[in-house]
């Protein structure tokens, strides 16, 4: 009786594993499209036009006490 009960339990477990393995592959992505990683492209620009606006970066902003010539060298190395 115990061997029969064990075989039903193992059969149930194996069948659950098979069913779950069949359904696990439906939602995964197979590859990344080159559009998604293209240079100079804002993601989701076609779906939401609000995301298409790029915010310009201030290249000349330095923290207080820094100069363009030293680039905070004195603060890093305590000169």
From Swiss-Prot:
Keywords: Disulfide bond, Glycoprotein, Hormone, Secreted, Signal. Residues 1-29 form the signal peptide. This is Protein RALF-like 35. Cell signaling peptide that may regulate plant stress, growth, and development. Mediates a rapid alkalinization of extracellular space by mediating a transient increase in the cytoplasmic Ca(2+) concentration leading to a calcium-dependent signaling events through a cell surface receptor and a concomitant activation of some intracellular mitogen-activated protein kinases. InterPro entries: RALF. Transmembrane segments: none annotated. Glycans are attached at residue 68. Its main location: secreted. Belongs to the plant rapid alkalinization factor (RALF) family. GO terms for molecular function: hormone activity. It comes from Arabidopsis thaliana (Mouse-ear cress). The keyword Metal-binding does not apply. It is found in: Secreted. Disulfide bonds join 45-52, 66-72. One of its GO terms (biological process) is calcium-mediated signaling. GO terms for cellular component: extracellular region.
């Amino acid at each position: 009786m115990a061997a029969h009960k064990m075989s039903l339990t193992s059969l149930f477990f194996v069948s659950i594993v098979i069913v779950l393995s069949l359904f696990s592959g439906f939602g995964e992505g197979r590859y990344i499209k080159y559009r998604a990683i293209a240079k100079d492209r804002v993601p989701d620009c076609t779906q939401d036009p609000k995301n298409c606006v790029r915010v310009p970066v201030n290249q000349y902003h330095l923290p207080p006490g820094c100069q363009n010539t030293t680039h905070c060298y004195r603060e890093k190395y305590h000169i």
